[in-house]
């Protein structure tokens, strides 16, 4: 069994000011939620801005995991894929887009949120190209578990996550191992 590398990101895109108060999540709330799962003992690659980098490093250091934390600082998030944010903003004002929305004020209707969501794939690829990943990789949303909705005991995260992620298919005559 091999250790899994975790990859995440955090950028304050203004969710603390969302119109729908039930969907608001301030930067501090995200950091509080991260404190719960930050104790997972795996190597963690975090994409964030310089303002948040020290906070994130400090949280991981509280659990003795500073050496297993790799911070990639990006202060120009919306310039990584030039022209994408303006396109998302244009779409967000399109009447067909607006009529399609079940919750008009949902986070997924925010062009910055959509841009950041798309960047998960960009960051995973970037971490791969930088040689930061083990063979087994998991994306963890920074606000995972929303502060204890599913796992009420934060100590549930105090472990080294290892898993044999090789996929096995069993057929009546043979077994195929995909690596």
PLM ranges: what are they?
Residues 27-43, 62:
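Short, acidic, metal-binding catalytic loop of nucleotide-sugar glycosyltransferases
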Residues 115-170:
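GT-A fold catalytic core of metal-dependent nucleotide-sugar glycosyltransferases
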Residues 1-29:
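N-proximal low-complexity "stem/linker" segments adjacent to membrane-targeting elements
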Residues 50-57, 179:
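Short, charged/polar "capping" segments at the starts of alpha-helices
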Residues 20-34, 152-160:
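Well-ordered, non-membrane alpha-helical segments in soluble/globular domains
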Residues 63-132:
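Active-site-proximal specificity loops/subdomain of glycosyltransferases
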Residues 169-179:
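Short beta-strand-to-loop element that shapes/binds the nucleotide-sugar donor at the catalytic cleft/hinge
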Residues 45-49:
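Short internal beta-strands
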């Amino acid at each position: 069994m091999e250790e899994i590398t975790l990859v995440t990101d955090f950028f304050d895109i203004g969710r603390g000011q969302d119109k729908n108060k039930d969907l608001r999540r301030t930067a501090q709330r995200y950091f509080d939620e991260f404190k719960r799962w930050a104790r997972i003992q795996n190597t963690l690659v975090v994409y964030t801005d310089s303002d948040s980098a020290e906070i994130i490093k400090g949280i991981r250091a509280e659990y003795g995991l500073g050496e297993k934390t790799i911070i990639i600082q990006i202060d120009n998030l919306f310039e990584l894929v030039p022209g994408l944010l303006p396109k998302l903003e244009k779409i967000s004002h399109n009447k067909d887009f607006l009529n399609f929305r079940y919750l008009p004020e949902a986070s997924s209707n925010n062009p910055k949120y959509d841009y950041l969501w798309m960047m998960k794939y960009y960051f995973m690829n970037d971490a791969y190209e930088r040689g930061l990943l083990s063979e087994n990789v998991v994306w963890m949303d920074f606000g995972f578990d929303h502060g204890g909705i599913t796992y009420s005991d934060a100590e549930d995260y105090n472990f080294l996550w290892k898993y044999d992620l090789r996929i096995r298919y069993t057929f009546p005559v043979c077994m195929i191992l995909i690596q």
